[in-house]
């Protein structure tokens, strides 16, 4: 992945080939990105915090193309090749309480399938997933690896509102 300080792949450039918890020393701002291979999660703050952005192979000439809110990218993580199976349980309350539903595929509208607008906890058994704040894969994004998420803050969200989610596939 190549990070550029200016739009349209101009200005200072930094090449990264693995995850990095703090990109601050390599560039001050990020206005364009070229992904040569693989899938990546970019974070607005160091140590994999803040707004998250999911990018795959392609060119992103300005931060709006990756649904960015500004030109801050301070950490990044490479997503390993996906598993052939996906499985996730979502819960209406924290600590895996309340109504539960199990999913194996994408969901463009959580309310239509779950009857709740909020997801307070989640258990990812297989695969990697992206949560989106709004239906139809819009709004803030949250990356989930296999593991237990007892509360929405565990996946980096400031509220439990999740409008849609999908499996992370390697995009080409």
From Swiss-Prot:
Gene Ontology molecular function, alphabetical: structural constituent of eye lens
Domain Beta/gamma crystallin 'Greek key' positions: 1-37, 38-80, 86-126, 127-169
Region Connecting peptide: start-end pairs: 81-85
Keywords attached to this entry: Eye lens protein, Repeat
InterPro entries hit by this protein: Beta/Gamma-Crystallin, Beta/gamma_crystallin, G_crystallin-like
Biological process terms in GO annotation: lens development in camera-type eye; visual perception
Database matches in Pfam families: Crystall
Chain's role: Crystallins are the dominant structural components of the vertebrate eye lens.
Subunit structure: Monomer.
Domain topic, free-text comment: Has a two-domain beta-structure, folded into four very similar Greek key motifs.
UniProt-recorded name of the protein: Gamma-crystallin-4
Organism in which the protein naturally occurs: Xenopus laevis (African clawed frog)
The encoding gene: cryg4
